[in-house]
Amino acid sequence: LHTAYRRQRQMCIRDRYMEGDEFSVETMSVDGVCHVIQVTDKLTSGAPYFVEMGHTQPSMFAEDIKMRISEVAKAGIKALGINHGPSHTEIKLTSTGPKIVEIGARLGGGCITTHLVPLSTGVNMVEANIRIALGETPDLCKKYDKGAAIRFLQPLPGIFKSVEGVDEARGISGVIEVGFMKKIGEVIPELSNGLDRVGYVITQGNTREEAVRLCGQAVKKIKFEMV
């Protein structure tokens, strides 16, 4: 332990700054075979914190680009020796091709695998993960090809006094869920990480474009009062 701490003080790892559109690849590995379930487009707050503010499935990019992104993810998963279970691989599409940001041997957060994947493909990755852990064969066959999206809600910083329009947003056909991570009376700081996000809207459409449009309609209905 002493040696490890000394090494930390004497060196650092420097990563190349990557510019380009951001994606995540949702995969499930079974007996060494990596199955790509979905490719997700990511929307962030931009510099300096790049907080994830939305996800959309399927990706809007052409099939050949999605294939390249998927192959890079699969190569990274293979290199790490992940043979069983889920992986969530974040990728940037740079001017020199897809580059891996990170690989997590886990299901994707931000409602990606709990909500968006089943809404866009019909594949229940949570159930599949449990079945793999039990030594059973998971069902990874896509049932349909629809659009799904989530957009996070973020008012200006201040004290969260009230919110209106939630019932109207929930009443829009195609809106699956409107939820909140913060309670009335909480202090909402300036957005710097995912824990600062206040709420979210999840939608499903026959296409990704429809899902995005429905998200936009629902978000416009929701009005925050901050003091």
Model-derived regions, located:
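Single conserved hydrophobic/aromatic residue that forms the stacking wall/gate
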Residues: 1-13
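Short, flexible turn/loop "capping" segments at secondary-structure junctions
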Residues: 5, 49-50, 109, 191-196
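Beta-strand scaffold of nucleotide-dependent catalytic cores
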Residues: 15, 22-43, 47-52, 72, ...
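A short catalytic or substrate-binding loop motif that flags glycine-/basic-rich loops and adjacent residues
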Residues: 17-20, 81-83, 193
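Bateman (tandem CBS) regulatory domains
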Residues: 51-59
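Active-site "cap" helix and flanking loop/linker of ATP-utilizing ligase/carboxylase catalytic domains
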Residues: 64-89, 95, 104-164
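A short, glycine/Asx- and small/polar-enriched loop/turn
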Residues: 93-99, 192-196
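Peripheral (often C-terminal) accessory segments that flank ATP-dependent C-N-forming ligase machineries
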Residues: 128-227
